[in-house]
């Protein structure tokens, strides 16, 4: 990794700091580049506050803050040098280590959807990626989070449907594809009139122009099945003969299975899709899941009572923007979850939501654990 300068991402927006603080120190000998990166920023104290806050997540913040406070009477330039050293130490100690087993992260992209999954073999999947209230969420939220985690390739970008809050970030990732980051394949729902849906057709054209392979999945199709690790992704919706009224209607639904864990990814699917799936499930004696990614950001018409009874999840993940104009998640939907003792996790309150499934346990964590 020689020749690559210090890569430090300290964003003006504190939301970015949460995900993308110090990415990598790859050449500590290049002092000139390191100095230039830091000295160009006017307020060293503000930088320090962001860095120490994030370091605190890793247990190092208190010690580093004490060192910095003791330097308060030192000149600005010397203080900057101290900060450089502390940045290097923090970056070395904060190197991201991938959890073993299956790792799932619902990113906070505001009013939109984005879920990253990494399987036991290191294959990366991105289920949707977009936002309507965060500008350039693909570049500043999704990409930076992935790079901080050391992810240089998304093997499968799995798109539920063509709405902007699910795809505009994916398009940004495609635009950024190159030597350091690539998108391998785009997976779209297999619908009847592919050309009649403008947003759907636009996503296909975007991927084609970038030279990215596109595959199509309908109910019953298997995206991946690894018997050696008991990992499987199956498309549950839309059905081949399904008559949809809008993009949300044909929103692809996927079942994630790994050992004894299962999660249903609903995209923007609502009651009509839920009913269709339950009719198809009649032949299956049992279809229970541990986790449900709530459809359509937890809208009033998602997660019907009969559907929740059918799948009986322990937790529900809801992706929505803080104080969004749609009032997602809807209070009636939250009441249904409460009445069935289903624990909700919300990006507008919890920020990023992580699930790690190892051989013997399922661990659920949130970035904001202050609640």
Residue positions per predicted region:
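Non-globular, low-confidence helical/coil segments that flank catalytic cores
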Residues: 1-36, 42-49, 55-371
